[in-house]
Amino acid sequence: LNDLERLARSPDTLTVCGAPEGYDSLIFADLARARGGVSVFIASDEARASSFDAALEFFAPGIDRMRLPAWDCQPYDRISPSPRTAARRAGALHRLAAHDGKSALIVVTTVNAMLQRCAPKSAMAAGGISAKPGGVLDVEVLKTYLSQNGYTRAATVTERGDYAIRGGVVDVFPADAAEPVRLDFFGDTLETVRSFDPETQRTTHQLKTVQFTPVSEIVLDEASISRFRSGFTKRFGAAGSGDPIYDSVSAGARPNGAEHWLALFHEHLDTVFDYAGDAALIALDPLVRDAREERLEQIRDYYQARKEAGKSGAGAMGAPAYRAMEPEALYLTEDQWAAAIEARPSRRFTAFQEPGDTSVDMGGKQGRTFAAERQADQNVFDVAAKHASALRKSGKRVLIASWSEGASDRMAGVLSEHGLSPIMAAESFEDAGKLQTNAIARVVLPLERGFETESLAIISEQDVLGDRLARPRKRRKASDVIAEAGSMSPGDLVVHADHGLGRYLGLKTLTVGDAPHDCLELEYSGQSKLYLPVENIELLSRYGQESETAQLDKLGGAAWQARKAKAKKRLRDMADQLIKIAAQRNAKSAELIEPPSGLYDEFAARFPYAETD
């Protein structure tokens, strides 16, 4: 057997040497294609999973692929994972449970996601319902299904897991759909199914069928409620009967944070390894071991903290006691992880060489970086062009990888000015292979570092220009609220998007609907109080001026809205003035000055920041 066949067919645990980052995704794609069935790549964290997934999109766009996320909340948290993340995870589990085991399916996931136990595979596989135009579907039955399987009723459907009912029209955003769907009923007859844009509410496609799957691993029906009540009382005794989580579930409600008692809603829990099956190929990032040890230590620390706090009979800041389940009930242990890996064919990637019969050398190495040339103040583009030309002469297929189409176009233009040609665009790895043999392919592929093999060389944008100074914009999450609120001190002034200037007094836990909710306590004029749920923290921003002379807004008053309207008018006036200036400039003419060819492209290519969308 050649090396690739051995990696694809061997049931043993093997180390894939000579597989630097980037090349590992190409090898993994080839293995998944050759094996068929389920192939799972476990990344050390979400950032690594995202970059690996993006590389797979380039190297193997034709192979069915999905992401399986972990919850985006801390272990033993009082809040649930975000609805979007919970829906993505539940949708991925349903899809994996329903897979036939034969066709190739790649699962890209993380250590955190794999350590989490899941709802039983049988429950997720059987948890879907489908409908098509002309069929009969009781709207009340659909409503009950959506409510029990984690969907949230909303006025307008915008996020995965939302649904809305307006007469004979039902809008739903299914777990694994790209867009929400609108179902038009006449009585119990489904007349049409359409997907629509959640922002404009306009129809995008007419659909012939639609499938709804759970957006939560908790199915809240009579059987699961009964199991939860029995299990909660058995574990925590009679004292647990007054717990807000217990009382909410007993009343048929889905309290915030209930997922952290997932084991009580089911007869047993499975693992992602169980979903993937015994024949699944498991591939491991080089940093998986460290990430696993760190995560298990974190889980133990959170559990011990909850356990110690629970001895006093109450949580922090007067919150109800947190009755935590032992880690083994919700997460895999070190031994269980090792046993699951050993029971399946597994491949550990590394860029280095390791001797032994269980190692397979794929002959890859990290590509050349041009750091020395940048520091020596040489023309790095000239050096890169000569290096690419030398690689081509050695018989390698050469690709220039950039992070965006604009950057790729600029890089190609600059390298062409320095004598590298022909440079041709390619959409995928397959397309690059179809170019004429002497062509350099320019591609959009977000690799941090390039690599070389016997027949292939990829030079990345970062190899030539140095590290990118990425400044991604992230929506603040409720799971980060303690850190964010911790950076504010009681007495600090904040601005609420709807209510204006107020004073932050601190975090406070309120019991609403028999469940605890963490809120930020804000004070306004007249000592009026506003309690802002932590999940809405993005509505706040810091007050950036001197606080001594600031006057608090009146809660519900018109002054804040008037100031906002005045500011908007000033912005419109400024925009009008800028438009007038632009029009005046456009009306004037002058002699055109042409810069030297390629000079601007070189300047633009050195821009170190990520381009905005």
What residues fall within each predicted segment?
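Actuator/coupling domain of P-type ATPases
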Residues: 550-561, 565-581, 598-604
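Conserved beta-alpha structural segments and adjacent helices that either
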Residues: 1-549, 567-592
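Conserved pre-motif I regulatory segment
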Residues: 2-8, 594-613
